[in-house]
Amino acid sequence: MADPVSVIEIWGGEPLSGHIPVSGAKNSALVVLGGTLLCSQTCRIRNIPDLMDIGRMTNVLEALGLKVTRDGSMLDVDGSHVSHSKAPYDIVSKLRASFFVIGPLLARLGVARVPLPGGCAIGARPGELHIRGLQALGAHVHMDHGVVHAYVPGARGKLKGAK
């Protein structure tokens, strides 16, 4: 016999209907926010949780020249004026997800300078996997005094597909 606590029985024979709001997922939202660097127009993103890490990522984007406006759980991110390729240490040091801006900066500007990220220190999570991925796409990447310097060589300065 099953434990009565682990069983849910529904009686009544009536169809169920309705809506259950689901909160946004922070880690997914951080990746999407980094991806807004690829857009030269305004991106509207819905169901974004109002959390400290989301605020830090929007601060990183604003420091790079994007304009971010929040209305409840919706963010408008205007990427028409990306003006910097270097993310500021004082913000990046508090957020591991800030590493997600390197690829979009390389794709958009051909260059990125991002300090090694900080944030939640649950185990060692070096950026080596990201760096190898960027190198596979044709970027030249090196570290200097805790800052990842990446650029795309050549006159066109575009990333290429990996094999």
Sequence positions of predicted segments:
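Structural preference for solvent-exposed beta-strand-turn elements
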Residues: 1-163
